[in-house]
Amino acid sequence: MSASYEPNERRAYAASLSRFRYDDGNDRSTLNLSADQRLLSRPYFLLNGLANLYTSRSSRDDAPYFNPSRDASLELGLRADHLAWRDYDNHFRHRLSVNAGRYWQEGYGSAWIPSLSYRHEWQWAMGRVLSYGVSWARPVYDGARETRYGFDAELRWGE
């Protein structure tokens, strides 16, 4: 179940509550709250502050997959959005997001978790958008820090 509220283009809030029932008898519940607040608006540049709070719990801590009995995180970040080129319905923009926060897992304590992402967005007609990006993060699982690199792409076709 999820809900979002955007009172205007400068502010947005979202909340989600999920329950997962696995075949092995594990029940996992999660709660996620997020906020996005515009800090600076210029004709071709936007700067937003980001906040995210997450917590989860599971009924089984001996599962053969990553499944903490309880965990939580709080992240704060900034997203810079630059509209580099625009011609009527066509544009190119790029975005840089920088986040840092604290992750806690029962039995393993807490650790800082940084992340970065950089994206391009090309729109060549109304509703026709190609977006792609790279990301880097240093999450912690069962007390061990890992490095995660990512690439994703999205093609939107329609209004």
Show where each model-derived region lies.
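Structured C-terminal portions of repeat-based eukaryotic scaffold domains
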Residues: 79-105, 109-125
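Membrane-embedded beta-strand positions in outer-membrane beta-barrel channels/transporters
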Residues: 1-2, 16, 30-34, 64, ...
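Gram-negative (and chloroplast) outer-membrane scaffold detector with strong preference
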Residues: 32-39, 43-57, 65-82, 90-93
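Transmembrane beta-strands of outer-membrane beta-barrel pores
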Residues: 7-9, 17-23, 37-39, 51-59, ...
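Membrane-embedded beta-strand positions of outer-membrane beta-barrel proteins
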Residues: 3, 13-17, 47-51, 76, ...
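Short loop/turn motifs that connect adjacent beta-strands in outer-membrane beta-barrel proteins
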Residues: 5-10, 38-48, 84-93, 123-129, ...
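Outer-membrane beta-barrel "beta-signal"
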Residues: 145-159
